[in-house]
Amino acid sequence: MKIALGIEYNGTHYFGWQRQANVTSVQEKLESAVSFVANEFCQIYCAGRTDSGVHATGQVVHFDTKAIRSEKAWTFGLNANLPADIAVRWAKVVSEDFHARFSATARRYRYLIYNHPLRSALFPTGVTHHHVALDHRLMHQAGQYLLGEHDFSSFRAAQCQSNTPWRNIHHLHVFRQANYIIVDIQANAFVHHMVRNIVGSLLEIGSGKQPVEWMDWLLTQKDRTLAAPTAKPDGLYLVEVKYPNHFNLPKNPLGPLFLGEPKIDFNHD
């Protein structure tokens, strides 16, 4: 039997998704809980391997098991055996041809910036604090240069193991909600650190250090050393993974929850 899970986690205290020796990972904690509930070892496969300190509200995973449990039993049983910063939002029996990574058609991330002169004690994690005033409209304009299929070498980490730097960005929206600026980006897939590297350069534009057209120039140069430093992981969330409709997977609010579900309107401030 193949089971898919919708997972949410705060990545602050984890060295990323992937199991590694001598460090704590999300995969390790989830595999431990699943194996306990299933009463057999179960290897977990995820849609996107998030980096150290990165969060998720819409991670999707799957595993194979001989155990027979109801979807409700999987959800509540796993949550009872997971740490407080990892939660299962749904469980579903899926067809044998489903794969959390290879069946996915798109991934969507949100990057949250707390744009205020002073940091917040209530949100020491889960957002990236930026004290310099940012113009989200300029950031949004700059992001439109990245839409479509391009060579994203200028926004690719040196240690990236992907065979190609080509990716297809479906949308990139930047909007403000009170003191928060949200960068919402969806693509077929992402090269290593791509979202954080793009956000790093958008911050330069939003703060007035670079013009909007700089983003177009960076893209054409295909040189990572010319772009801005990588943005911190604190504000990055994997919020959605898209699959063909026939898998009929449940959907949750994109989140994170404290944002509510913002209405994006680029015709007004």
Swiss-Prot record:
Coiled coil: none annotated. It comes from the Bacteria. It catalyses: uridine(38/39/40) in tRNA = pseudouridine(38/39/40) in tRNA. The active site is at D51. It is an enzyme of class 5 (isomerase). Substrate binds at Y109. Its EC number is 5.4.99.12. Gene3D superfamilies: Pseudouridine synthase I, catalytic domain, C-terminal subdomain, Pseudouridine synthase I, catalytic domain, N-terminal subdomain. The keyword tRNA processing applies. Keywords: Isomerase, tRNA processing. GO terms for biological process: tRNA pseudouridine synthesis. The keyword Nucleus does not apply. One of its GO terms (molecular function) is RNA binding. Belongs to the tRNA pseudouridine synthase TruA family. Formation of pseudouridine at positions 38, 39 and 40 in the anticodon stem and loop of transfer RNAs. PANTHER family: PSEUDOURIDYLATE SYNTHASE, TRNA PSEUDOURIDINE SYNTHASE-LIKE 1. Homodimer. This is tRNA pseudouridine synthase A.
